[in-house]
């Protein structure tokens, strides 16, 4: 069974895991888990229907990390840095996590406490992309219907919260 309606996890001949997309073209570029931005090789661009949808130059992940980190360093406000990183995550999760791993000590206070409290308070002003599944007392009577809208087929982890910090954004 595929892990998602949009991709599955496969292994190559060396046993290395990779994502095999079931979508191509414009839709592929809109899925943060699959979008590699300018890191798609020329062959991948042809096979995945990305010709003409990306700038022609292929950049490595290292080049992408250097570019976004330079931009990140120009931002002064912790909240603006948080927003910048979340927007990156909404576009390209591979690049986001690679960058954060390289700069974890510097970025963790931006992505989590103390900055996340301010981000939650400003949530309605900075919300851009839905992440995960939300159930509340307002939709509990339609929970089965709502679960059908989740694009994942093989869910192995669920994080539940009492909304203690999140109540500020409600």
Region annotations inferred by a language model:
Residues 2-163, 167:
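Metallocofactor- and cofactor-centric catalytic cores in central/energy metabolism, strongly enriched
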């Amino acid at each position: 069974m595929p892990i998602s309606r949009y991709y599955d996890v496969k292994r190559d001949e060396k046993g290395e895991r990779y994502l095999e997309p079931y979508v191509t073209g414009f839709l592929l570029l809109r899925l943060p888990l699959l979008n590699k931005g300018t890191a798609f090789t020329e062959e991948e661009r042809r096979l995945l229907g990305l010709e003409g949808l990306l700038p022609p130059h292929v950049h490595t992940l290292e080049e992408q990390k250097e570019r976004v980190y330079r931009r990140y360093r120009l931002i002064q406000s912790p909240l603006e840095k948080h927003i910048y990183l979340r927007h990156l995550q909404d576009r390209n999760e591979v690049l986001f996590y690679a960058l954060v791993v390289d700069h974890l000590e510097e970025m963790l206070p931006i992505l989590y406490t103390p900055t996340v409290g301010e981000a939650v308070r400003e949530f309605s002003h900075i919300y851009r992309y839905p992440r995960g599944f939300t159930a509340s007392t307002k939709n509990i009577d339609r929970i089965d219907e709502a679960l059908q809208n989740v694009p994942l087929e093989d869910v192995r982890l669920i994080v539940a919260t009492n909304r203690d910090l999140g109540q500020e954004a409600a």
